[in-house]
UniProtKB/Swiss-Prot annotation:
One of its GO terms (cellular component) is cytosol. GO terms for biological process: 'de novo' pyrimidine nucleobase biosynthetic process; 'de novo' UMP biosynthetic process; amino acid metabolic process. HAMAP family: Asp_carb_tr (MF_00001). Catalyzes the condensation of carbamoyl phosphate and aspartate to form carbamoyl aspartate and inorganic phosphate, the committed step in the de novo pyrimidine nucleotide biosynthesis pathway. InterPro entries: Asp/Orn_carbamoyltranf_P-bd, Asp/Orn_carbamoylTrfase, Asp/Orn_carbamoylTrfase_sf, Asp_carbamoyltransf, Asp_carbamoyltransf_Asp/Orn-bd. The gene is pyrB. Pfam families: OTCace, OTCace_N. The lineage of its organism: Bacteria, Pseudomonadati, Pseudomonadota, Gammaproteobacteria, Legionellales. Belongs to the aspartate/ornithine carbamoyltransferase superfamily. ATCase family. It comes from Legionella pneumophila subsp. pneumophila (strain Philadelphia 1 / ATCC 33152 / DSM 7513). This is Aspartate carbamoyltransferase catalytic subunit.
Length: 297
């Protein structure tokens, strides 16, 4: 594997290998050493979970790590990201973890520079977040073991969610039994890759084994979609009452950051069914597996 850009570019066998390798790292704490490999983290959007877990993954693998501070870099002088990568590559850096607001940017960089560097997509606009899909599936398999009988519900702003896009794809690749995308009509995607869409919260959650709650993007609510927070809260929030429609042992997940009291209640986020912190933990091991697969190949 030369680059890690989209789930759609991976075979089901490659995905399953990443999942098993992540669980191996978690349970054995036996990590390979790649001390000769240098990696740079370029985050053009704010991040806590993804940025830090990638850095921890890199350090667990004994890689040399460079974190580019955009505020003090030549990016403030107008340097294009393509030139930044070429410059860093000339210094001996081969691997680049990149988050950017532009859809498809990492793919474009891989097309232009792919002969000399390895690109890892840490999120591009509303398009894809492949490492999140891997860690989410690690978390689900760890708890539920099998996927073919599961009903998974994903709730929120599906239209603008790179998390939802990548998750639909991984569910399709791995043969998840049923995927339901629950969203107000105004946030429903024009194209669904896998699963079905509904704006009926209770029906969508009925009998679910896993419930994934997405962040409400307040900036889009106020500027683009003219959907107020009170409406969303009253009709689509994950509360103890709405969660009761799912199975009693349903997992509750959230990619973070959470808007408590908007898309999810604190009593649900912190409750016995919550696997949100387990997702964060698994993110480190999932990203270790991703990095190893690039270096080893």
């Amino acid at each position: 594997m030369k680059h890690f850009l989209e789930i759609s570019q991976l075979s089901s066998e490659q995905i399953e290998s990443l999942l098993q390798r992540a669980l191996y790292f978690k349970h054995t704490k036996q990590y390979p050493s790649y001390s000769q490999s240098i990696i740079a983290n370029l985050f053009y959007e704010n991040s806590t979970r993804t940025r830090i877990s990638f850095e921890l993954a890199e350090r667990h693998l004994a890689m040399s790590v460079v974190n580019l501070d955009l505020q003090t870099s030549s990016e403030t002088k107008g340097e294009a990201i393509e030139d930044t990568i070429r410059t860093l590559a000339a210094m001996g850096i081969q691997y680049f973890v990149i988050r950017h607001k532009q859809d498809g940017l990492q793919q474009n960089l891989a097309n232009k520079l792919g002969d000399t560097v390895n690109i890892i997509n840490a999120g591009d606009g509303t398009h894809a977040h492949p490492s999140q899909a891997i860690l989410d599936m690690v978390t689900i398999i760890e708890q539920k073991k099998r996927l073919d009988k599961l009903k998974i519900a994903i709730l929120g702003n599906i239209k603008h969610s790179r998390v939802a896009n990548s998750f639909q794809c991984i569910c399709s690749k791995l043969g998840v039994g049923e995927l339901v995308l629950i969203s107000p009509e105004i946030w429903q995607p024009s194209q669904v890759h896998f699963g079905r869409v509904t704006d009926n919260l209770n029906e969508g959650l009925e009998g679910a084994d896993v419930v994934i709650c997405l962040r409400v993007q307040k900036e889009r609510l106020l500027q683009d979609d003219h959907l107020d927070l009170d409406f969303y809260r009253n009709n689509f929030a994950l509360t103890q009452k709405s969660l009761s429609y799912a199975k009693p042992d349903a997992m509750v997940m959230h990619p973070g950051p959470m808007n408590r009291g908007v898309e999810i209640d604190s009593e649900v986020a912190d409750g016995n069914q919550s696997c949100i912190l387990q997702q964060v933990t698994n993110g480190v091991y999932a990203r270790m597996a991703i990095l190893e697969s690039l270096i080893a190949s």
